[in-house]
Amino acid sequence: MNNIVAIVGRPNVGKSTLFNRLIQRREAIVDSVSGVTRDRNYGKSEWNGKEFSVIDTGGYIRGSDDIFEGEIRKQVELAIDESDVIIFVVDVEEGITPMDDAVAKMLRKVTKPVLLAVNKVDNAMREKDAVEFYNLGLGEYYTFASISGSGTGDLLDALIDAFPIKPLPTQEEIVLPRFAVVGRPNAGKSSFINALIGKERFMVTDIAGTTRDSIDTKYDRFGFEFNLVDTAGIRRKAKVKEDLEFYSVMRSVRAIEHADVCILIIDATRGFEGQDQSIFWLAEKNRKGVVILVNKWDLVEKDTMSTRDYEAKIREELMPFVDVPILFVSALTKQRLLKALEATVQVYENRQQRISTSKFNEYMLKIIENHPPPALKGKFVKIKYCMQLPTPTPQFVFFANLPQYVKDAYKRFLENKIRENWDFEGVPIDIYIREK
């Protein structure tokens, strides 16, 4: 499982710029339809062959100029809880501020590695000014300039060295599929597992955030063994009262990255909200299987909303990845819970599916012949061979004479045709066009 790196610090010190540089992206991707900033605070990075996940703790905060120390404190607490290494960003131009002191005081108490990163150091004078940050009591510091990228190589070298050595998974952990039960606070995650197991495996109350730790439960249904995880990743501490997507998303990262299939539980009485969208996107981005369970359906007035209408509303928010099973359940009455588990097992099997190269070519090349990629600048794209790659998640490559002319719309067309002929429901798939 990847290490998780959290970037913390007060507003306007360059956290997001460093974040974007680490994941090699110029700007956040905003979904204008839903209003959700989908790719704002979480990304993947790699340095010297080591992959890791990066979280920008400021990524979901609006109006950051007005954030009080208390908000920053909550972000730092969250980073301490959920990350393996913390990067604390400060600004050499402003020097040490009272808020920097407050954050440093918290970080001095933790046992996890903390890298003090002094931003905007782009000349010899500022290198001298940076010496002041020794006074924060965090030891060695690393100078860099997030806009130009100067110094980030040394910071990344130190980051890789700071990663803890993690034990290799046991044979049973490798063999058994892992299903993560995810969702925003109080959607009914623990109740769902309790209903399946038939005993109070988890402490459940009406107060959001009562699941104290991630708990793996080995389970056997339909002769199929797997691990169920009710993640502490989607619980908030009592003192974190704000209903922000950020807290749910950050607490979801570890469980989702480690899962094969994510069971996303949403509260029928509240609808498919921002937190749900963010958690769904997180699972999709990590190429995990997804099953959506609409819990507490027994509490919804059926005269005002049918399952068909409700499902249609959810699928609108899932675009373009809509080939996902959606089931209406009640953990309280145990309505359709076994159906939900059967659907999860099916998604896992879909994710493991392998298509022979001969069958794949036989089916897809006929479709491509009848519906070839659009010509561009008078040049015609020809695809003569395709195959599924030997990867853990479904990935397909099509070999073309002019791969650069194949646009995303045609890739979606190919994906839809694959889904029409083979069952990949609940599973993200990747399409690559390569030069033959």
Curated annotation (Swiss-Prot):
InterPro entries: G_ENGA, GTP-bd, GTPase_Der, KH_dom-like, KH_dom-like_a/b, P-loop_NTPase, Small_GTP-bd. GTP 2 binds at residues 183-190, 230-234, 295-298. The keyword Nucleotide-binding applies. Pfam families: KH_dom-like (PF14714), MMR_HSR1 (PF01926). GTP 1 binds at residues 9-16, 56-60, 119-122. Belongs to the TRAFAC class TrmE-Era-EngA-EngB-Septin-like GTPase superfamily. EngA (Der) GTPase family. GTPase that plays an essential role in the late steps of ribosome biogenesis. This is GTPase Der. It comes from Flavobacterium psychrophilum (strain ATCC 49511 / DSM 21280 / CIP 103535 / JIP02/86). The lineage of its organism: Bacteria, Pseudomonadati, Bacteroidota, Flavobacteriia, Flavobacteriales.
